Amino acid sequence: MPSTAFILKCLEFTDTGEEVVLVAWNKTENYIAAGGQTGSIRILLLDFNSLSEQGYNISDLRTSTRNVRILMDKKLSLHDNALITSIAWNEKETKLATSDNRGLVFISSTDTGKWVRNLVNDSNRAAVVTTTWSPDASRILMVYVNGLVMLGTASGHRIYNGTINKGSAPKFGLIASNAIEVFILAWGNAICCYNFSGEEVWSVSPLLATNSDNHFVHGCWGHSSESAQLTALSPSRDPACNGSSMPQIKINSFSGDSMTLIAVTSNGMLCVYSVLTGELLSSVSTEIIPVNVQLSPGSHMLCITGSVQSSDSNFGLHQLRGNQGVSGDSTKHTAIVVVYRTADLATISRLRLPERVATSSSWDSTGLRLVLAAGKNIYIATVRPSYNHYLMNDGTMAFTMSNYTSTILSTASFVDDTQRPPMNVGALFSKKTAEEAPSSAISSFEERILDRARCNECVLFWKPGLQAPYQRWPARMIAVVGCKSYIAILTLKTNTSGTRKHHTHICFYTSVCAPIFSIDLPYVPFYTAGSGNYLVCASSSRISVVDIRGLANEAIGLVDAENVSYVYEWHADSYPLAQDRELTVARLTVNNPIVGVACCDVALFVARQDERVQRYSLPSLTLLETMTIKPNQEYMQTNCNGTVLACLHEDGSLVFYYTQSYYSEFLYAHHNPAEQQQQKQQPAPKPPQAQAHLTLLDTDADTAAALGFGQDSVVETESAPYVIKNSVLKNVNVSSGELLQDSAQARSGGVSTIPPYSPELIGIWGLVFSPEDPNLVAVSSQYKVIVFHLDTQTREDSIQTSAHIIGFSGLSIIASYLDEVSHNISSLDHAYYVLETQMLRELQEIIFGQQQAPESFNPLVDAALNRGCLNKNMISLTSDSKSGVPSSLFDSVAPKTIAIKPVRGQQPVGDMVDSGLDVTASNSSQPSTQTSQALYSKDGQISINLAGAVEYVKSHPSVHLYRIVAEASLITLRLEVASYFYIRAGDYVSYNFCESLLRLQSQDQRRAEMLMLIGNFSSAEHVYKQVLGRPDLIVKTQTDLQMWLSIIRAAKLSRTPGGNLLIDDKLLEKAHKSIGLYYMRQQQYAIASDFLQKSGDPYLYAESLFAARRYAELKALAVSLPVDEFANCIAKVAVMLARLGDVEGASEALVRVNDPHSAVHISLQLKRFDIAAAIAGKHNILHIIDRELSVYLKQLLAAGDDQGALELLRKTKQGEVIAAVIINLVLKELQTIFVNRTFPMPPGLFSKLRRIIVLAGKEATYVQREQAKKNLQAHASAAPDCMLTEQATNAAIDTFINEDDNSKAVHDVKAKNTGKEASSLEHELENAQSRLRSVPVIWRIARQTRFIVLSSYMLYIGNPEQALWPAIEAANYYHRTNDSQSSADPCIQYLSRIALPIAAQAALLFGDFELASNLLELIEADTELPASERDQLEQMSVLIYSEYNITSVPSKRKDNYQINCGHCNTLLPPYCGMCEKCHWQTPICVRTGQPIKSDKMDKTVLCQMCRSLATMGKTHLSVCPLCHEPYQ
């Protein structure tokens, strides 16, 4: 619905007939001040909240209203016989500043209810033009007609005092807040901005300045965002102010950059200027003669008061004539108020007043009310904004709102006076502007308004009482359309590739704000409409019908969407079934543009510019008829079956147009009396011969007579029992509103068209059709809601409320105070109401009587609204709420259409279910006291006026009333009458229930079944148990109705001494499971776990524990469940524990179910490698963790965390395997280094590798010693009589270590032989993945890396002689010459090949050419030596051999270049440390890399970890140079 405004109250200013000229509304204290022509000042304090609406009771809303109450009325005598020229409020201190034409300025304030005046200035020389406060009330500005300007602070300190003369009197003045230090003065021909020194900063002239009559009239401050500084749209700035000497503006805060100025001119132009630069940001023609302009708080709306340009203008004329009390020629009343929406400058309302001119206006704090000054009266107006609200099928309300300031600035501006601003039509765009523009200008019109898409609005999805509102903030939103189960949000998309092209993205959301499916349109629609099955979008030249059902089935995978299009489009000048529609659909030129659309599930209405409306059938899109309507419609909506079209026109009138398919007996007889008389003269066909007569209860003959059942009433019972063929109710399908085929054939002639129906209403701001009854429509007009019956063109008594109507639920109207919601989201729970129609209220009073009608909804009305209560939630009905239990039987039942009917002061349904779960709190053997009070009189008989109810529904046919009467008949056990009305209501399920009750012989059993149906379970159980003596039927009925709490309560009572065991364990577990699942859906997991613990389903119990965050119990469940019966459940619980990070609990549970592989994988995924290694070692599956453990170790070692890596490895207790894994890391690094190596090699390249190998050696040594200790302890336990000393223990450990080394040595020999047979080194690397190395081999590899680093460093510092020993030792030169002693370990071979070039370089540099030649021969024999390295060595050799005498022996050799064997005293070759005869090896110092002589052995230190020797040197070593272990 479009937004609107209407007059709420009119107050006479004075008794003497003085005209009011100015008004001001205090937005903090709610005071209204008004000033008149002769100096009268009147202060009013108003209250808009009625007592009935504050009570939060649904029954009170029938008479509630937003009537205005005057709490205070004070008249001040300040300006006697003087014209009031300005009125302004200081809202922070509640001070009122007034001035007059005699130069007097007063400031009045109140203290304890008494108003005190203070004279501020008395200037007899000139009249005051303006006395105004700054927006933050920190400053005050006084402007006089002679140009005198007085500017000061609110406390009285002067800021500026001077005279500014422009040759004429100023029109108005404004003072800015603290954000920017400027003030504004406006003359007729210019608006000037001054700083606080009185220097002019900029000036602007009014648009169309060549017209001498155009001048500035009034202005106010505006607000905008930081991005609003745009390029000037016209050269209206004074060029004299430009230049380097231009005065500057002092800005105190960032918000000062975005301040704007709004001004109106005498020719009706509304202009927006930047305060900082004076640039024109936007302009629009108001088409009135403005006098005053005011911006609402929050800057959402703008109000302009004045008069129409001509007395015959139609603006607001319909609303003016509709107001009561307006007499005489309405053309003399030219006062008008125009309200704009600042987001897009769309017109909200044109409010015509019965006065000559509206001189002033002011907003209240909410921005929803206006006080107007016009003639001799003060008018209070209410603005009813549109929230684009819709009611979804599940009761969710969707509506739009904005929570921050809208901007009145836009990149697209309406400077052209020939174009009007966009109207609030459909979603956003202007229908009238599109109509007035020629077809060739349609595209340019779109370009101007596309950038006005709303980007600051939020779409809220709110299900009252059941959930918090969901929010969606779409970017560049165009429209929001309700489609019953979905909400379609249209957003604007722009394609900037090539030419600028716009398209529309449509996304459909569910009630929980979840996007479900979407579609794109290649154009931007102006008009939209939606139903449950279709979404219709249209521009002026194009129309599209989207099949929602097909999209929904595609989204959930029910259909194959390949080559299927769910959008049907055609051009406006074509028709849906045209053969060339696909070729012409994108054509922009159009002869008869589209100006509106409306649709339902079966019909589509398309309005054209020539005042015709085309009606198509859906889904066939066949043209059914063409209708003629009034021009300039703003809003269109159709009823549920597409037989009535409601149009709200631009003049404010509402018209209902009847289609040719619509039929009403009353309207047809009224408009076609002759044809109706002819039909009456035709004899009616005789009914078939009766086979059985319908007999009502013998005790109530009046009811039978009222129903019209006599001797001629018969029923056929062969095919279907009790199918009534004739009755007093006419054979018309009142639920559809369309004429049946037999009735249409009986009429003579064609179908007549019923004239349009136009109710005399003004200020219409809401219209909702019933989704079930096509004749029922609710209209919001001013402050009341009126229900119309279109079949009789009658209206019900109005319901006075200012709530927005959202939808229908049967005969109830769903309404919400969205105005309050838009200002405070926390008040959502108090803004939802259900209003009853007059028919529902009258039938309720007839059935129960006026004295017995309960305050809230009674059981019968609720039962009807819930469609027989066959789908109620039995858990909520059987729970025992302590404090929030509804007062009626069905208050806790959630109907189908709406989610809940909350009553203020009561608890929502979601909270009522949690009743403490005390199943023994209530006694089910006693009948309900509520039922006794509501249904039974004092003598125990049911007190229901059934005859009066039947008589009432005869004159008010409605399916909803039929259902209520059927429920009343069922409660009184008049089953024949109940069956009849259930048939009339179309409720065949309840009809079959009544027929099944008729087959029962016992009246008590019928009563018990009836009580079960209506929800009075305690009374039904009382009848079953006490009267019939059949407690088993109670259990059966409770099971069928899923009354699980009652079953649990009965089971607990039956297990007491003397109880009957009617409920077995299986049924009890099912009850606990159902209740637990219910609480899981309600997200009350703690309560759910208590029930699911006894459900026999441990997996559901585990899920509830997980959701309830009861993790200790979840872990205990995984340990306590039997493995044989619940293995799968234990595995699922282990996954839950893993999600919580409890690796120990998850792995323990998986090991219990014999799934160690999963336990290892989970431990690896959660980075618990110690647990993974322990489990893998225990179950002999270590091969599955090698890769993961290697990666993790690599990360630790790369980060330098050696201690962390060592601790992790020792926790695994698999030292030998882990050492092999570490060496594998070294192999990969060595392979990379060897391939990418350079010559000479940097010294620090092997530091990381050496550290890794040392770590492996430490781990292997540690594991070996731990195993030796275990063996020693085992040996000691075998010989308990022997005492082990420390010396014996160390000796035994050394013996075990030596034995282990010998066994590993034999293993290495075997591996060496195997390596000889290998074809390549790569194959040997692959086999090394699982090879275990002995501790000496690991430390040998570590020593190789140490010697490579040491020799490389010696070469780096220029000492080749010191590099020869460590390099040759690392290269295993003498081991390679003797093949029997060479090692097949791939790491040793890699390191040897890397060390050979270093040794050769050292020998060449030192001058030992013989040794260098031997080394080069070994290098040349290496086929894998890189060519670049080979060339470097050859060049170095040639260079050195050419410079030196190669036959000479080096003269600089030291004494230790050649040593004797320490065993056989054989002289060894130079730089050789191994004897070939006895295999004696020279000890090498790991600190210097040099051999240790026998006489120096006493000055060495032995490392207990790596067993390496190091000379002490000049300083004592504290740690081992190889493994960095402290010396002991």
UniProtKB/Swiss-Prot annotation:
The keyword Transferase does not apply. Residues 914-933 are annotated as: Disordered. Pfam families: Beta-prop_WDR35_2nd (PF23390), Beta-prop_WDR35_TULP_N (PF24797), Zf_2nd_IFT121 (PF23145). One of its GO terms (biological process) is intraciliary anterograde transport. Residues 920-933 have a biased composition (Low complexity). One of its GO terms (cellular component) is axoneme. It is found in: Cell projection, Cilium, Flagellum; Cytoplasm, Cytoskeleton, Flagellum axoneme; Cytoplasm, Cytoskeleton, Flagellum basal body. It comes from the Eukaryota. Gene3D superfamilies: YVTN repeat-like/Quinoprotein amine dehydrogenase. Its main location: other. SUPFAM superfamilies: Putative isomerase YbhE, Quinoprotein alcohol dehydrogenase-like. InterPro entries: Beta-prop_WDR35_2nd, Beta-prop_WDR35_TULP_N, Quinoprotein_ADH-like_sf, WD40/YVTN_repeat-like_dom_sf, Znf_IFT121-like. WD repeats lie at residues 123-170, 244-285, 619-667, 759-798. Keywords: Cell projection, Cilium, Cilium biogenesis/degradation, Cytoplasm, Cytoskeleton, Flagellum, Repeat, WD repeat. Component of the intraflagellar transport complex A (IFT-A) involved in flagellar assembly. PANTHER family: ANAPHASE-PROMOTING COMPLEX SUBUNIT 4-LIKE WD40 DOMAIN-CONTAINING PROTEIN, IFT140/172-RELATED. This is Intraflagellar transport protein 121. It comes from Giardia intestinalis (strain ATCC 50803 / WB clone C6) (Giardia lamblia).
